[in-house]
C-alpha cells in the first residue's frame, strides 16, 4: 500500500495525542496486557524530543507510532501499532516507508527500535537488523534493531 490522499500519516502535537493513545491502549494495554503506567510515559505528555504520528485511511484512525530524537543523527522509533481489525492491510509497511523517508529528510543516519520478538520478521522485511540479545520490556521479549539510512 502506498500512502495517498486517503491514506496518510500526520504529526500529532503532544496536546492532541488522544487518538494515538486510544490505539495504543487497545493494542498494548488491552490486547497485550501492558500496565498503563508502563505504556503511558513522559514522552506522551510534554517531551519536545518526541513526535507522535497518526496513521489514517479515509479519515479513519488505524495506527500510530512515535519518534524520539534524543541522540544526534539517530531517530528511535517506538510504539508502532495498528488496530487489530486493520492489520494485514499494509499500514505498517506504509508507516515504515514513511518513517525512513522522513528520517532521511531530517538528516538522520540511523533508526533504532525495540522490536517485540514476534514482529522481528516484519522489521527485517523493512530493512532492519537485530543488534542485541533478547531483553524483557513490560514482560514481553524484545530485541534492539536498527536500520542504517
Residue ranges of model-derived segments:
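Conserved beta-strand in the GNAT
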Residues: 54, 60-68, 76-81
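Conserved acetyl-CoA pyrophosphate-binding loop and the N-cap/start of the following alpha-helix
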Residues: 86, 90-98
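A conserved beta-turn-beta hairpin within the catalytic core of GNAT-like acetyltransferases
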Residues: 69-77, 87, 107, 137-142
Amino acid at each position: 500500500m502506498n500512502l495517498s490522499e486517503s491514506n496518510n500519516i500526520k504529526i500529532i502535537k503532544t496536546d492532541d495525542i488522544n487518538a494515538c493513545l486510544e490505539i495504543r491502549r487497545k493494542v498494548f494495554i488491552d490486547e497485550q496486557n501492558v500496565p498503563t503506567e508502563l505504556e503511558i510515559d513522559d514522552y506522551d505528555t510534554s517531551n519536545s524530543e518526541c513526535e507522535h504520528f497518526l496513521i489514517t485511511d479515509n479519515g479513519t484512525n488505524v495506527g500510530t507510532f512515535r519518534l524520539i530524537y534524543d541522540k544526534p543523527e539517530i531517530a528511535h522509533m517506538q510504539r508502532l501499532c495498528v488496530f487489530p481489525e486493520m492489520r494485514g492491510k499494509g499500514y505498517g509497511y506504509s508507516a515504515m516507508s514513511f518513517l525512513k523517508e522522513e528520517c532521511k529528510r531530517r538528516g538522520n543516519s540511523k533508526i533504532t527500535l525495540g522490536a517485540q520478538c514476534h514482529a522481528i520478521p516484519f522489521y527485517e522485511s523493512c530493512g532492519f537488523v537485530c543488534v542485541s540479545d533478547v531483553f524483557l520490556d513490560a514482560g514481553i521479549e524484545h530485541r534492539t534493531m536498527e536500520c542504517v539510512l
